[in-house]
């Protein structure tokens, strides 16, 4: 039996067949996971570098872990850049420089498919079916802007169903935040004029808008329509205030200002967004796997990964030179199908000041990040020592569940590591129960956490409100998935539970032939915080001093999982209650349920309706209306 070649011996054996062409290569470990993706102008020359003896520590580790190698030939270097960026995004190899937080930026969307359009927050790349303004650096920026615009222009903010169901103005009209087009308090022409003013403001034509409003105010005053003139005056004042807060500049119109800084081998890339001369916020990024990398390498990889997800402005202004700039510009243009793009480094003037400001912000962000990182590193070492782990943990998974006597049961998993919580890795498990509503429990929340129902094919069990059965179900599904995703194996699993839960974890691990360090964390005799007990295989139950930083850290992990479980349980319960409140009424099938929802716009509106209002719905007789009313008000 011959030994399989690995490391530089493997690469040496492949070199004879590798062409001197541009392309992309992929290195795989023993688990057949992609650990590195690279591009090359000349594949043979690039891969020959890996058999040299003077490689840095990171590259030596990478080569030593390489058990197989694949490559793809491309027609050009630009094509190689594009393919490399796509594969890095797909496989997230551990030795590549990675942009972990790649959420798309939010926009403000003005709907164009309704007689009375509304402004909405929108996140995504498909900018169609409306007029879009942005991007903004955070949801907070969008929410603040929407709130200000709502006060100034009073456009509607309700859903179409709610809009169609109104017979009288809602609270938004009473507090002067909406003109109530739903009940005819404003006509289409006047509303369209307001929509035009919103467009002018969001497109940067504030000066012209204020001039037009001033003229209109004078006309209304001359016509003795003083109340309407006062409203226009207040709008002009509010617009001036918002414009002052926005920080309008004539130095740049549409551009991203990007600054990279480095300290102790860690990098921060700060991005400032400017659209129509207005600052739309800034956000710091901390690329990973940057060991032994240069600023130039990190910035280049950042640009290629960042603009796979984000909208590209005509100008990108950076603080550090990059080689191969023309190819990078071409690659970004190809990703976004964008005709015009420049990447520049200012030498003087206002643009240089903007870059310097971005650089100062990046330094501050990096210092804060390093303080947090150092604290987490110290805690990770203490976790290793406390639980006798073979190495400092890279990934900790914490499990909990939530239910009411077995109903609406959900299990959750949260993930933490040296850089804090990794919310993209959070998972929600919808659990089977005879009385609970099951199905997908994909969660959305204010932090835009990326979590989803685990989709492994698995046997379903009836949990019957049994915590142990719920844990068995969650772990069976999770560990089955981990067999397919060994790169996601945790260094430690923490389960909210005690001695009984310990037995369940052992049982599932043995059944699936898995061996992952785990600990069960219970509240202690009186279920008081600070008296937690830890249960491990082969060790006596032990506690920690409640004032230790490590104890506080473990409590934070447990509480994060607990809160996440409760949140998703409430979502599951809310969805189920909405459905069952109508479904349980005799004589209400899908057709009548849809008729009620179409007429009133929401479940709450159905619940709030009077007997007379219910009987006006097509297909609902007076006797059925009475049954519905009594059923919805029985408590």
Curated annotation (Swiss-Prot):
Which keywords label this protein? Answer: Cytoplasm, DNA damage, DNA excision, DNA repair, Excision nuclease, SOS response
**Stretches assigned to coiled coil:** none
Q: Which domain of life is it from?
A: Bacteria
Record-linked InterPro entries: GIY-YIG_endonuc, GIY-YIG_endonuc_sf, GIY-YIG_UvrC_Cho, Hlx-hairpin-Hlx_DNA-bd_motif, RPE4, RuvA_2-like, UVR_dom, UVR_dom_sf
Q: Name one GO cellular component term.
A: cytoplasm
Q: Where in the cell is it found?
A: Cytoplasm
In the record, what terms sit under GO molecular function? DNA binding; excinuclease ABC activity
Span of domain GIY-YIG: 20-97
The record's section on SMART domains has: GIYc (SM00465), HhH1 (SM00278)
Any one Gene Ontology biological process term? SOS response
Q: Which Pfam families does the UniProt record give?
A: GIY-YIG, HHH_5, UVR, UvrC_RNaseH, UvrC_RNaseH_dom
Segments forming domain UVR: 207-242
Please give the PROSITE patterns that the UniProt record associates with this protein. GIY_YIG (PS50164), UVR (PS50151), UVRC (PS50165)
Keyword ATP-binding listed? The answer is no
Instruction: Keyword check for Metal-binding, yes or no.
Output: no
The record describes its quaternary structure and partners as:
Interacts with UvrB in an incision complex.
Q: What does this protein do?
A: The UvrABC repair system catalyzes the recognition and processing of DNA lesions. UvrC both incises the 5' and 3' sides of the lesion. The N-terminal half is responsible for the 3' incision and the C-terminal half is responsible for the 5' incision.
Q: Matching PANTHER family, A to Z?
A: UVRABC SYSTEM PROTEIN C, UVRC/OXIDOREDUCTASE
What HAMAP family does the record point to?
A: UvrC
Q: Give the similarity note.
A: Belongs to the UvrC family.
Q: What is this protein called?
A: UvrABC system protein C
Q: What is the lineage of its organism?
A: Bacteria, Pseudomonadati, Pseudomonadota, Alphaproteobacteria, Rickettsiales
